[in-house]
Amino acid sequence: MNILVVESQEKLAEAGYKLIENVVKSKGNPTLGMATGSSPLGIYAEIRKNKLDTSHVTTVNLDEYVNLPHEDKNSYHYFMKEQLFDHLPFKATYVPNGMANDLEEECNRYEGILAANPVDLQILGIGENGHIGFNEPGTPFHSRTHIVELTESTRQANRRFFEKEEDVPTHAITMGIGSIMKAKQILLVAMGPKKAEAVKELLQGEYSEACPATVLQRHPNVTVIADQEALSLCSEAIADEHRQVFTISDLLSDSRVGETAN
């Protein structure tokens, strides 16, 4: 696992963009796994600013709320259109359909999409309770795309995006942890003190379904971009053990970048 320590959101965005640019420019028809929420906003802004050629890129999104219309400003369909899809051309874009009449069938359909479009680089944030995607604590590490009931802590974390508390969805459709782990490369971004406990568990916690992010300890190609606040609870020894690269140039020249996961 590589750790890249940054001083600001701007530096995080620049570093994340460089990783994505490297994949997009080095592969013929890459697939990017996209995340939503506040964590990747700066990265998406960099993609827009640099007018990255994404005409050959396929995207697959991690998750979507259930029973939230696609045109709702808080849906992840809307988020992706606002951040990227209305600004740049893509070969194909996929977001789970939380409005599907048969949600179990939608989960199966989405797994088929993932099988047909293996992810070259998956972007992840990390929840305060260690969730990745909407995979809450206790989710089996072998899980595939599924419907999840959101925990109260996750709903409260997303409350700020909705006018009223009762408007916050109670369920979501999400790529499973097993689905996420199939990505060839994973980029996890974390900023601020609220993420410190989760990042500590990721780096030095026990490999356990009680903290979904700890599954990444077993992935062969993970890069964590974080600031000092997000790393503030980690022991220096643990941080140094994982801090194998120090600059984005070092990271891009590292022979493991782009390796296929087992």
Swiss-Prot record:
GO terms for molecular function: glucosamine-6-phosphate deaminase activity; identical protein binding. It comes from Bacillus cytotoxicus (strain DSM 22905 / CIP 110041 / 391-98 / NVH 391-98). Belongs to the glucosamine/galactosamine-6-phosphate isomerase family. NagB subfamily. This is Glucosamine-6-phosphate deaminase. The keyword Hydrolase applies. Catalyzes the reversible isomerization-deamination of glucosamine 6-phosphate (GlcN6P) to form fructose 6-phosphate (Fru6P) and ammonium ion. Its EC number is 3.5.99.6. GO terms for biological process: carbohydrate metabolic process; glucosamine catabolic process; N-acetylglucosamine catabolic process; N-acetylneuraminate catabolic process. The active site is at D63, N129, H131, E136. The lineage of its organism: Bacteria, Bacillati, Bacillota, Bacilli, Bacillales. It comes from the Bacteria.
